Amino acid sequence: MAVLAPLIALVYSVPRLSRWLARPYCLLSALLSIAFLLVRKLPPICNGLPTQREDGNPCDFDWREVEILMFLSAIVMMKNRRSITVEQHVGNIFMFSKVANAILFFRLDIRMGLLYLTLCIVFLMTCKPPLYMGPEYIKYFNDKTIDEELERDKRVTWIVEFFANWSNDCQSFAPIYADLSLKYNCSGLNFGKVDVGRYTDVSTRYKVSTSPLTRQLPTLILFQGGKEVIRRPQIDKKGRAVSWTFSEENVIREFNLNELYQRAKKHSKGGDMSEEKPVDPAPTTVPDGENKKDK
C-alpha cells in the first residue's frame, strides 16, 4: 500500500500536475535536477570528463556516482512517505536531486560544482514556487481586518490559516485548505487566511512563530465567539510545533468539521444563528519539550 497510494494519487492528479509542471519554476527546477545526468550522458559534453571507470568511458556513471544516486532514491522514498499531495512528492524529488547534483559536480570538478551551486542560488533568488490559484471560499485578512472580522459577528465560526508564502509546507497545504473551504463553507462556518510573513504583528498577537526552526507554519486556529478554541499544530514547552500532518482527513477530524457544518446549516435554514457552544477538540497530550522529538 505504501507504493500503491502515491501511484493512485498520481493518476488522479495528472491534469492538475501537468499544469503545475508546465510553469517556468518547475521546468527550470527539473532542468537543474537532471543537470548531472545530461552532462555525464550527452556527447560531446561528456567526452572530456574525468572518470574512475575501469574501461575509461567518460560518458557513463562510475560506481561511486551510482551509489550516490541510489542513496538519493532511498532518501526521496523515505521523505515521500509523509507527503500528502503530489506536489509535495515532486517537490521532494526536485530538492534532493539538486543536493545530489551538487555533490556529484563537486566530486567531478570543483569548478563545475561552484558553477552549479551559483546557478541554484540564482534560481532560488529569482524564481518563486507557483502559488495555488484554484477555486476557494476563503477570506484574506490583514493586520487590521482579522480582529474586526472575528469580533463582528460572534455567531460565525472561523477557521483561520496563518501562513507565509515562503513556506513550502504552506504552499503544499494551500490546495487542501481550498478544497475544505469549497466543501464546508457556509453562512455560519467561514474560512480565512492571514499572511504572517507579511503582517508580523499578527503573528505576535496570535502567538504564531514565523521562525523555520519552530515549524509552526502553517497554523490552523478555530475561533468561536471571537475566541480561540482549537489550534493545530500544538506547541510544546520549548515553543516548537508538535509534529502533525496537515492532511484533509486530519483537519476534518481534529476540527470536527462535519459537526460544525451540519450545525451551521441547521441554524442557517432555521433562520436562527444562536450562539454556538464550543466544539471540544479530540484529547491530545502535548509532550514536554524534553522528550518530544520531531518525527
UniProtKB/Swiss-Prot annotation:
Topological domain (Extracellular) residues are 49-102
GO MF, one annotated term: identical protein binding
| Parts forming coiled coils | none
Q: Which residues are recorded as modified (Phosphoserine)?
A: 211, 243
Superkingdom of origin: Eukaryota
Task: Write out the residue ranges of the motif Di-lysine motif.
Answer: 292-295
The entry's cellular-component GO terms read: endoplasmic reticulum membrane; mitochondria-associated endoplasmic reticulum membrane contact site; mitochondrial membrane
Does the keyword Transmembrane helix feature in the UniProt annotation? yes
Q: Which UniProt keywords apply?
A: Disulfide bond, Endoplasmic reticulum, Membrane, Mitochondrion, Phosphoprotein, Signal, Transmembrane, Transmembrane helix
**Membrane-crossing residues?**
103-125
Membrane topology designation: Single-pass type I membrane protein
Matches recorded under CDD domains? TMX2
Q: Name one Pfam family in it.
A: Thioredoxin
Where does the Thioredoxin domain start and stop, copy by copy? 114-269
Q: Which residues form the signal peptide?
A: 1-48
Topological domain, Cytoplasmic: which ranges?
126-295
Which residue ranges have biased composition labelled Basic and acidic residues? Answer: 269-279
**Cellular location(s):** Endoplasmic reticulum membrane; Mitochondrion membrane
Gene Ontology biological process terms, A to Z: brain development
| Region: Disordered, residue numbers | 266-295
- Outline what the protein does: Endoplasmic reticulum and mitochondria-associated protein that probably functions as a regulator of cellular redox state and thereby regulates protein post-translational modification, protein folding and mitochondrial activity. Indirectly regulates neuronal proliferation, migration, and organization in the developing brain.
Subunit annotation? Monomer. Homodimer; disulfide-linked. Occurs in both reduced and oxidized monomeric form. Oxidative conditions increase homodimerization. Interacts with CANX. Interacts with ATP2A2.
Domain comment, as recorded: The thioredoxin domain lacks the 2 redox-active cysteines, suggesting that it lacks thioredoxin activity.
Protein name listed in UniProt = Thioredoxin-related transmembrane protein 2
- Organism equals Mus musculus
Q: Which gene encodes it?
A: Tmx2
